[in-house]
Swiss-Prot record:
SMART domains documented for this protein: EF1_GNE
Entries under Pfam families matching the protein: EF1_GNE (PF00736)
HAMAP family named in the record: EF1_beta
Keywords: Elongation factor, Protein biosynthesis
One GO molecular-function entry: translation elongation factor activity
Functional description taken from the UniProt entry: Promotes the exchange of GDP for GTP in EF-1-alpha/GDP, thus allowing the regeneration of EF-1-alpha/GTP that could then be used to form the ternary complex EF-1-alpha/GTP/AAtRNA.
Family the entry assigns: Belongs to the EF-1-beta/EF-1-delta family.
Signal sequence annotation: none
Annotated protein name in UniProt: Elongation factor 1-beta
């Protein structure tokens, strides 16, 4: 069984969102068998900063869909999109 690394852009609802708190909440909703291998922060515009975690998922779990859904359901998340994926 292989693993897939996915860089996922998580846009907060506003610049006022506490990114440290949002990061903790994202880590808390990870589906079983997945892990986060670091976070980056990307300045978007007008003070808005996106979180970009690199998520490692088992190849046999159907990809990143479960992670995307879990992240999208976190309070203060406006949108979730896959930036890149690759096999490990």
């Amino acid at each position: 069984m292989g693993k897939v690394a996915a860089k996922i852009k998580v846009m907060p609802e506003s610049p006022e969102v506490d990114l440290d708190d949002l990061q903790e909440r994202l880590e808390g909703v990870l589906p079983e068998g997945t892990k986060i291998n670091g976070f980056e922060r990307e300045d978007v515009a007008f003070g808005l900063v996106a979180l970009t975690p690199t998520v490692i998922v088992p190849d046999d779990t159907g990809g990143t869909e479960a992670v995307e859904e879990a992240f999208a359901n976190v309070d203060d998340v406006e949108s979730v999109s896959i930036e890149s994926t690759g096999r490990l």
